[in-house]
Regions:
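Positively charged n-region of N-terminal signal peptides that target proteins for export
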Residues: 1-7
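Bacterial N-terminal signal peptides
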Residues: 9-20
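Intrinsically disordered, low-complexity segments enriched in polar/charged small residues
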Residues: 8-9, 116
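OB-fold and OB-like single-stranded nucleic-acid-recognition modules
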Residues: 20-119
Length: 119
């Protein structure tokens, strides 16, 4: 085995270990609620079917997406894979009731749901 091959092997093992460390730590939960664009919801409380077009445009533009449950609790969403936003999973469901399963992490009063699946 050459030195270069050994170096690449060690690098791959370290990279794999670091990816494992990047997984969010928390319980797996299922949340039912409405998919909202956080800008409009936080600024003016806008949500529901009448807000679907605006919510979709805002989310497409890059605004964060959240889930608001029946109690009014807000879950900010993020993608679980490759540190991507959850936009691809939720964009077509803006202003609709969804069931989201993922890893819940709470820090400083903020609830972040790392999304695994959306129904």
């Amino acid at each position: 085995m050459t030195r270069q091959t050994l170096g690449w092997g060690v690098a791959m093992v370290l990279a794999t270990a670091l990816i494992g460390l990047a997984e969010p730590k928390g319980p797996t939960v299922t949340v039912k609620g409405e998919a909202v664009d956080m800008w409009c919801y936080m600024e003016g409380g806008d949500h529901g079917p009448a807000h679907k077009t605006c919510a979709t445009m805002c989310a497409r533009a890059g605004n964060p997406i959240g889930i608001v449950d029946a109690k009014g609790d807000i879950y900010l969403t993020a993608g679980l894979q490759d540190h991507q936003p959850a936009r691809d999973l939720l964009l077509s469901k803006m202003s609709e009731e969804v069931t989201v399963t993922g890893t819940l992490v709470t820090k400083g009063g903020t609830k972040m749901l790392f999304v695994k699946s959306v129904k």
